[in-house]
Design a protein with these regions (language model features):
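Sec-dependent N-terminal signal peptides
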Residues: 1-7
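C-terminal motif of bacterial Sec signal peptides marking the signal peptidase cleavage site
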Residues: 10-12
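A compositional/structural signature for long, glycine/proline-rich flexible linkers
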Residues: 15-455
Length: 455
């Protein structure tokens, strides 16, 4: 017979202790959360009969016609210097062809699987031809790829195409729309039959008219894992996930399994609410190795968008920045505190200061912007002048020494400095400094970030 002391010695010597059901529940939730958030986002975004500027039936593109404002609630932390084009696809019955024009500006396509991993990045400015076509298929596709079309395999049946096209100002929107009009999507069968113009109608369900993250947060434990298990069946995990999938199967979470919240007893829903309320904080703690810190700023570094088995990191991003790019395309330094370590507050006034020659370094067609968000919900803040960011195209006034000051406050500064004003209104807010197509010094965290000083 093994004594308790001996068992303790075994654990201390590296024999792993068996996980409790509560620990497995956390692992299962973290593993499946991006999949469930993606599914909710897809349901909301395809909940329409015909194409609009915010929704389209499955496998069809829809294009935002304007930059995001405070009314935009579909995706957290929306950027306000690119216009989105999107397509939520389902490859379970047929492949999907995406048709794109060559551009002379930043117009980058991020293709994600159902777990929100970026499986392909397409830069339209790099095209050799005026039009390029891409065929998206499941990994087990055995059909023919038409000549002149590039095949991209997706490990899951469902996925998300997110296209960001830079828009310099309100007058530039007409040029962005001209680019959007040259984009198209249609099934492989439609292409082969020469019937690419037909766009099947979708279905509207009033029950799918929700804010995705809030919808997921409102699910019961049973409803959540019923949905997760079905999604795992439709979008099977990869071989890299085998260890985790085998582990969480012990509480019947996995493809073709039947979950029963009764295994957690009468306190199941209390446990679930506690988990829902703490998961973002726990995932952030687990992801510190990927957090790059520089001055009062920090940003999500690699492997963002190319998560591999960094499940807690992937879950965190699904809550705070769904659809984020890999660092090769963009980095997003975030500031919640000023340079003295004090929490940013809407009742204070701040100066964000770039030294001369220390504006964010970017590659050709790259750009940068500073955007403010309400920390209570990660959305833009309403303001009287409808200004949500300052960017490298803004009409700002530089200091005599060539440095740049951005004034972050609720009330406007002096008239001559209003072009440098970024309005804020929330009790607590944070800033995101987006840098698209960053130079290597940014990716390597060697570029000096701007200071944020209280006035």
């Amino acid at each position: 017979m093994l004594t308790a002391a001996f068992l303790g010695t075994m654990v201390g010597c590296g024999v792993p202790a068996k996980q409790t059901n509560e620990e497995l529940l956390y692992d299962a939730f973290v593993y499946t959360l991006p999949l469930v958030v993606f599914d909710a986002t897809m349901k909301k975004s395809t909940n329409t009969v015909t194409v609009t500027d915010q929704q389209a039936p499955v496998n069809q593109l829809f294009h935002a016609k304007n930059l995001a404002t405070a009314e935009f609630k579909d995706v957290v932390t929306p950027n306000v210097d690119t216009v989105y084009s999107q397509c939520f696809f389902d490859l379970s019955e047929d492949g999907l062809i995406l048709e794109l024009p060559k551009t002379e500006r930043f117009c980058v396509v991020e293709v994600m699987d159902a777990f929100t991993n970026a499986i392909s990045i397409i830069d339209t400015a790099s095209f050799e031809k005026d039009t390029e076509r891409f065929l998206f298929v499941k990994s087990d596709f055995s059909g023919q790829t038409p000549d002149g079309i590039k095949k991209i395999e997706c490990p899951t049946a469902k996925g998300w195409i997110l296209i960001r096209t830079i828009c310099n100002d309100a007058e530039d929107i007409v040029n962005v729309r001209a680019i959007q009009e040259k984009m198209d999507s249609y099934t492989l069968m439609q292409y082969v039959s020469g019937n690419t113009e037909e766009k099947p109608e979708g279905v509207y369900d009033p029950n799918n008219n929700f804010i995705p993250v809030q919808y997921v947060q409102g699910l019961s434990m049973q409803a959540y894992f019923d949905k997760a298990n079905q999604l795992l069946k439709d979008n099977p995990p990869t071989k890299d996930d085998e260890k985790t999938v085998k582990s969480i199967a012990r509480i019947n979470v996995g493809p073709s399994l039947t979950f029963d919240s009764a295994i957690f007893g009468d306190g199941a829903e209390t446990l679930w609410k506690e988990l829902m309320g703490s998961v973002a904080k726990k995932c952030l703690q687990s992801s510190q190795a990927y957090m790059m810190k520089n001055g009062c700023w920090s940003y999500y570094g690699a492997p963002i968008a190319e998560f591999g088995t960094a499940y807690a990191y992937r879950a965190l991003i699904s809550l705070v920045g769904l659809g984020a790019n890999p660092v090769s395309v963009a980095v997003y330094p975030k500031a919640e505190y000023d340079s003295d370590g004090v929490r940013l507050s809407g009742d204070q006034q701040y100066v964000l200061h770039f030294e001369k020659d220390e504006l964010p370094p970017v590659q050709e067609n790259g750009f940068w912007s500073v955007t403010a968000y309400d920390s209570s919900n990660n959305f833009l803040m309403d303001n009287a002048i409808d200004r949500y960011c300052i960017n490298d195209r803004s009409e700002v006034v530089y200091n005599e020494d060539g440095s740049l000051d951005i004034y972050i406050q609720s009330e406007p500064p002096a008239d001559e400095l209003r072009g440098n004003w970024l309005p804020v209104s929330a009790e607590q807010f944070h800033l995101i400094l987006r840098i698209y197509l960053p130079e290597g010094s940014v990716v390597a965290n060697e570029w000096p970030t701007p200071s944020i000083a209280k006035k």
